[in-house]
């Protein structure tokens, strides 16, 4: 990364507690470690997938995720392309993957997290329905012809 006058180190290497909390949360979801993920959110969490119903509270997140996100049922993977932090707000540009058996749907997600007192208080994801539809079609095709399903970015 190019250095500019006044920069003490490249921006790509800047880590904050807030970004570590958010990426740690996403990694816990990848491991299907719901208990670890729940420990990283506030009791009054607001989780919104834009255009879908809002989930409120740690218990609401637990009720939504625990039944489905577990090994042998449904998996989740994430590739964070970019992360930015401004105070208590963390932005992520990422590719998410939802998998069930051989089915794998990958799609772009923009996330906005607000960290309060070391825990995630707001988790708001935005996505493109067309991109999700393409990911689902590729995922279905990939069940029959594995090469039709694109690889997770690295």
Where are these regions (language model features)?
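Charged/polar, solvent-exposed surface patches and flexible loops
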Residues: 24-27, 39, 63, 67, ...
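A beta-strand edge to alpha-helix "cap/lid" segment located at domain peripheries
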Residues: 2-10, 69-154
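Hydrophobic alpha-helical core bundles mediating ligand binding, dimerization, or RNAP-core interactions
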Residues: 22, 29, 41, 61, ...
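Short, low-complexity N-terminal intrinsically disordered segments enriched in polar/charged residues
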Residues: 1-39, 43, 150-154
